[in-house]
A protein has these predicted regions:
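Core segments of small alpha/beta cavity-forming domains
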Residues: 26-95
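Surface-exposed, charged secondary-structure patches
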Residues: 74-146, 210-213
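Low-complexity, intrinsically disordered terminal/linker segments enriched in charged
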Residues: 133-213
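N-terminal signal peptide c-region/cleavage motif recognized by signal peptidases
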Residues: 20-22, 26
């Protein structure tokens, strides 16, 4: 996923949307901790209620669009690897709904910046590797990346039962000097870890597990 993060941000228009803009009159703001939780709910789950609350919290004309763009990255079942495999896509979505991702520690390098450590319990698909080595997903060919039927079948079974592994994911936020809403500076760390956990194929091709990097 790492090599695809910039492309994903550009495709979603997040880079432009996340630029600071003039704030509007806003309703009473939630606590910073709750605001950081909203971001996780939107990015990880695409939660509609959290998306609406985040859009209001941001307090700008772009707020709803930012929240919608962040929510769109949660739809991993729409990745090219899932095309033609609706059972695998449905299994992915069911497992994703059970993901727990909460705010851990928060560090403030400066008064108006925050580095938030999210504690996320994401599936560990290492047990899928033997099947993947026999049926790898090509990412550099003339066609969109697709799973072979053998891999899709194994994935559908394993994504439902794979053990969780806790990951600590740091995301940076900032706000205006006069206070206001916390804005995510770059959602790529959380987006990338989420995608790599559920769709590890690109990362496995780039950095085969067990090999020194």
């Amino acid at each position: 996923m790492r090599a695809r993060e910039f492309t994903a941000l550009k495709r979603l228009g997040l880079a432009a949307l996340l630029a600071p803009v003039a704030t509007l009159a806003a309703p009473p703001a939630p606590s910073p901790g709750h605001a950081f939780e909203l971001y996780a709910q939107v990015i990880v789950h695409g939660d509609a209620a959290a998306q609406a609350e985040l859009g209001r919290y941001l307090g700008t004309a772009k707020g709803p669009a930012i929240a919608a763009a962040l929510a769109s990255v949660s739809h991993l079942e729409q990745a090219p690897e899932m095309a033609d495999w609706p059972q695998a896509a449905a299994a992915l979505r069911r497992r994703q709904a059970s993901v727990r991702c909460s705010v851990g520690s928060v560090h403030h390098p400066q008064a108006d910046t925050a580095d938030v450590d999210y504690r996320c319990h994401l599936p560990d698909l290492t047990a899928l590797l033997p099947v993947y080595r026999q049926h790898p997903v090509p990412f550099n060919g003339p066609h969109p990346p697709q799973m072979a039927s053998e891999l899709a079948s194994a994935y559908t079974q394993m994504i439902a039962t794979a053990p969780d592994r806790e990951r600590i994911i740091t995301v940076s936020f900032e706000r205006d000097h006069d206070g206001g809403a916390w804005r995510v500076q770059n959602p790529s760390p959380l987006m990338g870890e989420l995608a790599d956990a559920f769709l590890p194929f690109f990362e496995w091709n780039e950095h085969p597990p067990g090999e020194d990097r």
